[in-house]
């Protein structure tokens, strides 16, 4: 991983010059097109135009624009094709006439590659206040007191631009501050152990994970390293992770982990598994099995994230704060096994009227996972549930200590399922309740059983519940409790 001296000005590695950034696709000649004519139309003008076009192409001149007879609107076929791009596939064929082909899109792959190369060249040649490398900082630390002192900031640390053939683990260990090129695609073929603080900026680059290991990135306990201001723990931002052939966990964090603007596409296992402090902000999870798993005694902050078509978005076994997120078409957006704070989220259920077929056995009983599932716990309090919008969702409420009091939540077309002991512990005076339905479980029918997969990884037998509609028993009487009371507005900052 030879790296040029950052003090030397010039073109970075991988670029022969600024002119080489221009894509070579512009020099390629686009296939000529001729006007589609009905059979039998052998006019002299058409033959002359075809002969003239072939002579001009043979002479190396620019191909002449083919002529055509005017249509009913007074315009020829070429003008119609220019005004209506959707007709180009019918009005244009290849020069050899072997079949219909559509016109290339306005933005091709070559133009996208050229834009990415221009962006990479601009980022790599930009002037920054970088004055010292991570190795020099380690050499300057003679004793343990120097290791604890934060003499430099992340802005002063020299950036290493990772090439597709470089070793991720070695680059993180040696340079700590690593950047990825947006015009390159990276591949992880083995486990990456991270044992020091690092700052990885992806710049929108794609990283494909293709390894048979159980974990792709293991963030282990951090050793004694020099302190750099702004680089606390493992920080990864603006990276797109894909793994069509990977069946393990992407991130296994045993130390502080910050994921900022990271995207996960199509992982059939856990994306982030945290055993300690983790902050996930501005990330996107598309078609993943499990998004964020917070293990016991962990503290997680998940905010401004997007969960789309995930089987299980968030699994909370520790202390979690989930705020300002959006979920769409997820089997279960959040499974709460411990304490949690759920505020300012927008959750849209499945467009199709089908329930999730996955179970949870967290409290010793098997229940179908709902969009937001609060499992029973004899010693835990209810989660804080405020300012959330639920549309076409289902909410499962187990038995807990205290009273579940959702505050200013919109439960639009939402079904609430109450376990037998939790009906008297739910207060719905502060929600928008016109289209909600509340069901209470009376008993479980042991004669009607189904074997379903569970979120723990196994399969269990579930007894079919016998339920009763208790919507009107728990819905507040709005003729007595007016909507102008303090539950829907106050004199503080929440005033309308």
From Swiss-Prot:
Listed Low complexity bias regions: 45-61
Region (Disordered): 1-74
A GO CC term assigned to this protein in UniProt: host cell cytoplasm
Main subcellular location of this protein, as a coarse class: host cell
Compartment(s) of residence: Host nucleus; Host cytoplasm
PTM annotation (Phosphoserine): residues: 490-491
GO terms of molecular function: SUMO ligase activity; ubiquitin-like ligase-substrate adaptor activity
InterPro entries, alphabetized: Adeno_E1B_55K_N (IPR006717), Adeno_E1B_55kDa (IPR002612), Pectin_lyas_fold (IPR012334), Pectin_lyase_fold/virulence (IPR011050)
GO BP: symbiont-mediated perturbation of host apoptosis; symbiont-mediated perturbation of host ubiquitin-like protein modification
Pfam family, one: Adeno_E1B_55K
Alphabetical UniProt keywords: Early protein, Host cytoplasm, Host nucleus, Host-virus interaction, Modulation of host cell apoptosis by virus, Phosphoprotein
Entry comment on modification after translation: Phosphorylation at the C-terminus affects the subcellular location.
Positions of disulphide bridges: none
Modified residues (Phosphothreonine): 495
Functional note: Plays a major role to prevent cellular inhibition of viral genome replication. Assembles an SCF-like E3 ubiquitin ligase complex based on the cellular proteins ELOB, ELOC, CUL5 and RBX1, in cooperation with viral E4orf6. This viral RING-type ligase ubiquitinates cellular substrates and targets them to proteasomal degradation: TP53/p53, LIG4, MRE11-RAD50-NBS1 (MRN) complex, ITGA3, DAXX and BLM. E1B-55K probably acts as the substrate-specific adapter of the SCF-like E3 ubiquitin ligase complex.
Comment, domains: Contains a PML interaction motif that allows the subnuclear PML localization.
Quaternary structure (record): Interacts with host PML-4 and PML-5; this interaction promotes efficient subnuclear targeting of E1B-55K to PML nuclear bodies. Interacts with E4-ORF3 protein. Interacts with E4-ORF6 protein.
The family this protein is said to belong to: Belongs to the adenoviridae E1B 55 kDa protein family.
Protein's name in the database: E1B 55 kDa protein
Organism: Human adenovirus C serotype 5
Lineage, top ranks: Viruses, Varidnaviria, Bamfordvirae, Preplasmiviricota, Tectiliviricetes
């Amino acid at each position: 991983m030879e790296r040029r001296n950052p003090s030397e000005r010039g073109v970075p590695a991988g670029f022969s010059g600024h002119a080489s950034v221009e894509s070579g696709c512009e020099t390629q000649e686009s296939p000529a097109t001729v006007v589609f004519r009905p059979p039998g139309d052998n006019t002299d003008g058409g033959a002359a135009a075809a002969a003239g076009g072939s002579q001009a192409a043979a002479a190396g001149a620019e191909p002449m624009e083919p002529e055509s007879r005017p249509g009913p609107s007074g315009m020829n076929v070429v003008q119609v094709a220019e005004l209506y791009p959707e007709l180009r596939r019918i009005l244009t064929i290849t020069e050899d006439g072997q079949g219909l082909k559509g016109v290339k899109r306005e933005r091709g792959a070559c133009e996208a590659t050229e834009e990415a190369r221009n962006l990479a060249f601009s980022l790599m040649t930009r002037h920054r206040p970088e004055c010292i490398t991570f190795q020099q900082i380690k050499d300057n630390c003679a004793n343990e007191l120097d290791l604890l002192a934060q003499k430099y900031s992340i802005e002063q640390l020299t950036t290493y631009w990772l090439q597709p053939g470089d070793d991720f683990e070695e680059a993180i260990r040696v340079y700590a501050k690593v950047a990825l090129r947006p015009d390159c695609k990276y591949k992880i073929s083995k486990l990456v152990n991270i044992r020091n603080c690092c700052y990885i900026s992806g710049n929108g680059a794609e990283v494909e994970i293709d390894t048979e290991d159980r974990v792709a990135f293991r963030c282990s306990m951090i050793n004694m390293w020099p302190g750099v201001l702004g680089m606390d723990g493992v920080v990864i931002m603006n990276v797109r992770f894909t793994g069509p052939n990977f069946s393990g966990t992407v991130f296994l964090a045993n130390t502080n982990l910050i994921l900022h603007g990271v995207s996960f596409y199509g992982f059939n296992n856990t994306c982030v598994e945290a055993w300690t402090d983790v902050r996930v902000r501005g990330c996107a999870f598309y078609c993943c099995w499990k998004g964020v798993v917070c293990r016991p005694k962990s503290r997680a902050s998940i905010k401004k994230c997007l969960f789309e078509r995930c089987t299980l978005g968030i699994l909370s076994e520790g202390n979690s704060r989930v705020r300002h997120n959006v979920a769409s078409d997820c089997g279960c957006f959040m499974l709460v096994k411990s304490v949690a704070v759920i505020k300012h989220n927008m959750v849209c259920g499945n467009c199709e009227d089908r329930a999730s077929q996955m179970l949870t056995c967290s409290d010793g009983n098997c229940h179908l996972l709902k969009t937001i599932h609060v499992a029973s716990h004899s010693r835990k309090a209810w989660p804080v549930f405020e300012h959330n919008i639920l549309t076409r969702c289902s909410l499962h409420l187990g038995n807990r200590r205290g009273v579940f009091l959702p505050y200013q939540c919109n439960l639009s077309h939402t079904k609430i399922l109450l376990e037998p002991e939790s009906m008297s512990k739910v207060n719905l005076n502060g929600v928008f309740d016109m289209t909600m339905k509340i069901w209470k479980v009376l008993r479980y029918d042991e004669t009607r059983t189904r074997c379903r997969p569970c979120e723990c990884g196994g399969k269990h037998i579930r007894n079919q519940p016998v339920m009763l509609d208790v919507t009107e028993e728990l819905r507040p009487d709005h003729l007595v409790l007016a909507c102008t009371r303090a539950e829907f507005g106050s004199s503080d900052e929440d005033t309308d």
